[in-house]
Amino acid sequence: MTLQKDKVIKWVRFTPPQVLAIGFFLTIIIGAVLLMLPISTTKPLSWIDALFTAASATTVTGLAVVDTGTQFTVFGQTVIMGLIQIGGLGFMTFAVLIVMILGKKIGLKERMLVQEALNQPTIGGVIGLVKVLFLFSISIELIAALILSIRLVPQYGWSSGLFASLFHAISAFNNAGFSLWPDNLMSYVGDPTVNLVITFLFITGGIGFTVLFDVMKNRRFKTFSLHTKLMLTGTLMLNAIAMLTVFILEYSNPGTLGHLHIVDKLWASYFQAVTPRTAGFNSLDFGSMREGTIVFTLLLMFIGAGSASTASGIKLTTFIVILTSVIAYLRGKKETVIFRRSIKYPIIIKALAVSVTSLFIVFLGIFALTITEQAPFLQIVFETFSAFGTVGLTMGLTPELTTAGKCIIIVIMFIGRIGPLTFVFSFAKTEQSNIRYPDGEVFTG
């Protein structure tokens, strides 16, 4: 299979990383053109704002330069909803589904692309995974929309309430963070139905499809794969730490939790603890948060959620591998062991490569925005981390960005969605060498 795969790669004009990058780019362009149509907007929309909105939706980020609820018509909002769905599940998923509907055979080249898009270790079973993934996603979005409609239909009426329910269900499951309301979800800060449904959706979408299918298949923690164990325990621990941190730091802040009842404080702390790694919805004003909370949120946005999910960031498992490897080194151990499993050296190197490349991209983004924007440094840093993690949280800078600033954020969102290594591999040529050079000594630390 390896030999056959190498032959196919040589035959294909573009490598899988290049196809993924080009596919996302073309989706963004088509989306921008659709959003500029008169039928899509209530008032004229500039090309850069259309491009930014399409990029934000396709990369499932959620940063917005215009108000989604008032700037766009139902048609325009439906286009955004479609871009979110394509961006969340991956355009290759929809391409394969279309080929299957047309009754055509899916070749090895297409299977390789799906493998790359879904970040799967092997090529076997990827088409079956696409079918299950699509049906599972649509089912959970429709069920969630029905539950949300119980709360929203009485408030907005049948047509608007049902549409808002579907829009927010799709936006949440795909970790987009787009909302039809100017204050996002701040009006529902203490609403149990909205809080539970929305967080369930973006945690489910962000934990990764591989983990979900593993849990549904095996059901017992002992039989889960190492990846699933890391994701479940890491998610629970990080969410608990984040909730406690937000609750303590913002408890007396009059701009966030200070004016809320204790129950609403807990709901808001929970919501804002889990949203930075995935979705980008907010029930509190991030522009009013204390600097300590903002800095902690930067870490959460950079970590992100799970591999093979609708979220971005360096991924939680990457963070865990690096952290445990450092701890193992400091304790004088030669191996990194997690849950009685040794982590292979190439995995550790890949985790380091992802992290260092990501930090470099974020640094370049911050550097560029400090040149183009006249804004407080912390706002620039926050917006850059949010764009790279495709989170969508903002301290209020995004609507005020210059044209150059919007272009920079678009590029960062794009790289964050396809992944830093995929982006680099789409340009770089990988060469294997059989030459073994002698070891050299380098002083570090």
From Swiss-Prot:
A Gene Ontology molecular function term of the record: potassium:chloride symporter activity
Main subcellular location of this protein, as a coarse class: membrane
Localization: Cell membrane
Transmembrane segments: 19-39, 46-66, 79-99, 127-147, 161-181, 196-216, 230-250, 286-306, 313-333, 351-371, 377-397, 408-428
Pfam families for the chain: TrkH
Keyword Cell membrane recorded: yes
Membrane topology, as annotated: Multi-pass membrane protein
Keywords carried by this UniProt record: Cell membrane, Ion transport, Membrane, Potassium, Potassium transport, Transmembrane, Transmembrane helix, Transport
Biological role stated in the UniProt entry: Integral membrane subunit of the KtrAB potassium uptake transporter. The 2 major potassium transporter complexes KtrAB and KtrCD confer resistance to both suddenly imposed and prolonged osmotic stress.
Protein name, as recorded: Ktr system potassium uptake protein B
Organism: Bacillus subtilis (strain 168)
Gene giving rise to this polypeptide: ktrB
